[in-house]
């Protein structure tokens, strides 16, 4: 886990990157430990503050949960990360629901409006919208999927938002 002990449950503290590397006295030991670790977790903020990790490891997949709440500036470092001379991450899966939990922005509509025609041509019309929302609205059905079963609430309760907002 990449992050701080302050925001980590004590049960998971041994898995914090800092703690898991404590038994690595040499740089080569650190490199090997990172190279052999299959899964890394952390917030976008925590990972963006440690982009040097991508100098040590290439990833085949990054899953970004709650992506509908994350503005592009918070993702750009991860999306553009490099390993050697290629992309540090081969594939991204963005998970979220912009209708339920939109991006968090404090800008007013007028401040966030994009007037540049080139940016508008790629769907960037409002800086308060997440990359997830923009990609979702511009993508073809083949490139996205919708959750068909959820376990958080009784089906009768979930029927209202499903019919009102999604179908």
Predicted regions and their residues:
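Conserved helicase motor core of SF1/SF2 NTP-dependent helicases
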Residues: 1, 31, 45-47, 53-167
């Amino acid at each position: 886990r990449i992050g701080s002990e302050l925001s980590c449950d004590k049960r998971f503290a041994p898995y914090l990157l800092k703690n898991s590397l404590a038994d690595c006295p040499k740089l080569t030991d650190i490199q090997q430990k990172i190279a052999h670790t299959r899964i890394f977790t952390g917030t976008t903020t925590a990972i963006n503050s440690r982009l040097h990790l991508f100098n040590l490891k290439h990833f085949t997949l990054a899953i970004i949960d709650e992506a509908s709440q994350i503005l592009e500036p918070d993702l750009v470092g991860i999306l553009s990360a490099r390993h050697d001379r290629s992309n540090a991450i081969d594939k991204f899966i963005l998970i979220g629901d912009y209708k339920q939990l939109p991006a968090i922005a404090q800008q007013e509509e007028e401040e966030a409006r994009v007037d540049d025609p080139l940016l508008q041509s790629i769907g960037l019309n409002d800086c308060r919208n997440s990359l997830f929302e923009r990609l979702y609205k511009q993508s073809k059905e083949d490139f996205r999927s919708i959750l068909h079963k959820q376990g958080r609430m009784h089906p009768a309760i979930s029927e209202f938002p499903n019919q009102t907002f999604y179908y």
